[in-house]
């Protein structure tokens, strides 16, 4: 299982309705790969890392984007406003929505951008149809599940179904390795309802931390993701009890995705290693971990 580098990228809001993504540039493939494999493959990108990079969230929203295809004037206008951020966002969006083995291409002047598919969660939208409500929700959940607050490499397991109800493949080996039940992710970025996260197991105790801070840290760890408490109070399991199939918030029921971690992704202040989620200080908490990171100054 190879590791990949996480890029810090701003998660942008899709502020208007969604028309079709342009037709596939490659024939569709049926893939039996697990989500872990799909998350690790492709161009050295770690699609398990949508890290917020501090840019103005509202200022980089999809203003005026009708999404009538990647060749439309509206898409070009949106993309060229912030091409670097838009390019990174599209890599994650296409990875979530489009099946593995397909790419989406956009050209602007002498520059050509190619984005690879991965999880294939929105098959209708991927093949040119307007995004259904279910597709909007599951792609939003995917983007939320890929958030990594610290922009570092973290291998995760994503469980759930596509918009059409097809389970994301997961092997017994994957479930046996990724034993930390992290969280549930749901919402709708496309219509402005927002993006929500809950913790599956209990939140981490005061001395522990993780690069995957959004679910297990609780509170306001990853704005604009809104932490809604325990998944168990808002979500229902699938028939097998493996993952949360739906979650309800503010009277709206969403298609959700569930994530799992490996035990080694949880760090404890005092283990002698100063982790990216820890900092210097005089205490024994991650934000002031003297034993691992020393005193400041």
Residue locations for each model-derived region?
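Cysteine-rich modules of extracellular adhesion/ECM and protease-associated proteins
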Residues: 267-297
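Bacterial N-terminal signal peptides that target proteins for export
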Residues: 1-8
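C-terminal motif of bacterial Sec signal peptides marking the signal peptidase cleavage site
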Residues: 14-17
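Long, compositionally biased low-complexity segments
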Residues: 68-266
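Bacterial lipoprotein signal-peptidase II cleavage site
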Residues: 19-25
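Post-signal peptide N-terminal segment of mature Sec-exported envelope proteins
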Residues: 26-49
């Amino acid at each position: 299982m190879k590791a990949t580098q996480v890029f810090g990228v701003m998660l942008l809001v899709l502020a208007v309705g969604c028309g079709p993504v342009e037709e596939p540039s490659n024939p569709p493939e049926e893939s039996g790969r697990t989500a872990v494999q799909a998350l690790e493959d492709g161009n050295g990108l770690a699609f398990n890392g949508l890290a917020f990079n501090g840019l103005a969230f509202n200022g980089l929203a999809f203003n005026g984007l009708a999404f009538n295809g990647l060749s439309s004037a509206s898409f070009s206008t949106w993309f060229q406003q912030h091409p670097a951020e838009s390019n990174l966002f599209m890599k994650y969006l296409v990875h979530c929505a489009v099946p593995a083995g397909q790419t989406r291409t956009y050209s602007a002047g002498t520059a050509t951008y190619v984005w690879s598919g991965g999880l294939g969660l929105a098959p209708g939208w991927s093949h040119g149809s307007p995004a259904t409500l279910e597709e909007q929700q599951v792609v939003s959940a995917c983007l939320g599940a890929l958030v990594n607050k610290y922009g570092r490499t973290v291998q995760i397991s994503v469980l759930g179904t596509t918009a059409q109800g097809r389970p994301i493949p997961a092997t017994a080996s994957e479930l046996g390795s990724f034993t930390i039940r992290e969280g549930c992710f749901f919402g709708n970025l496309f219509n402005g309802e927002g993006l929500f996260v809950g913790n599956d197991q209990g939140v981490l105790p005061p001395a522990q931390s993780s690069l995957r801070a959004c679910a297990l840290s609780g509170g306001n760890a990853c704005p604009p993701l809104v932490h809604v408490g325990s998944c168990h109070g808002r979500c229902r399991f699938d028939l097998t009890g493996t993952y949360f199939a739906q979650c309800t918030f503010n009277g709206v029921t969403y298609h959700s995705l569930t994530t799992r971690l490996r035990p080694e992704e949880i760090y404890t202040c005092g283990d002698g290693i100063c982790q990216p989620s820890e900092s210097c200080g005089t205490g024994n908490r991650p934000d002031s971990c003297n034993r691992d990171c020393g005193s400041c100054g």
